[in-house]
Design a protein with these regions (language model features):
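Active-site loop signature of alpha/beta-hydrolase-fold enzymes
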Residues: 64, 89, 134
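Single conserved hydrophobic/aromatic residue that forms the stacking wall/gate
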Residues: 126-136
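Double-stranded beta-helix
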Residues: 106-125
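Short acidic-glycine-tyrosine-enriched beta hairpin
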Residues: 69-81
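Ligand-binding loop in jelly-roll beta-barrel domains
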Residues: 85-106, 115
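Residue-level detector of short, conserved catalytic/binding motifs and their immediate flanks
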Residues: 53, 78, 99
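Tight coil/turn sites that cap or link beta-strands
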Residues: 41, 76-77, 85, 104
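Generic protein-terminus/edge-of-domain signal
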Residues: 1-66, 70-72
Length: 136
């Protein structure tokens, strides 16, 4: 059986809403989470951002995903990609299981490689709302 929420139930951020937990290490820049949004404080993964990219799958349930100023409702079997440094929040009114991967884009290709310059960097430079665009 998979462990839900890996021992924590609240996102901790600094004054800019940057998440303070490390997602992997410099040597291994990848972290897999298996979480139930319902088990988090106030049944949400509150506003935060990080320099890593994130893939989130809704394995079971329904959740509202707020990414920048946009809202997406995802159901079982649907997924979302969250770009680097983009403010986001997840909430649910029921138990909703979300396996997710948070990792450095450099895991895909080295910064000085053709793959990075041609395919990865343009995705990372896509203009999305920044953490500063969200008001309390």
């Amino acid at each position: 059986m998979k462990n839900l929420n890996d021992g924590y139930a609240k996102i901790i951020t600094d004054e800019t809403l940057r998440e303070t937990i490390s997602h992997g290490s410099e040597e291994y820049p990848f972290r897999y989470y298996y979480e139930d949004i319902w088990l988090f404080d106030l049944h949400c993964i509150d506003w935060h951002w990080h320099p890593e990219v994130e893939f989130v799958l809704v394995e079971n349930g329904t959740a509202d995903f707020f990414v920048g100023s946009s809202r997406y409702v995802l159901n079982t079997g649907e997924a979302i990609f969250i770009n680097t440094q983009v403010i986001h929040r997840f909430e649910s009114s029921e138990s909703t299981i979300i396996p997710n991967m948070v990792f450095s884009p450099l895991l895909i290709a080295a910064e000085n490689s053709l793959i990075y310059r041609k395919y990865i960097k343009p995705c990372l430079l896509y203009t999305s709302p920044s953490p500063r665009d969200v008001e309390e």
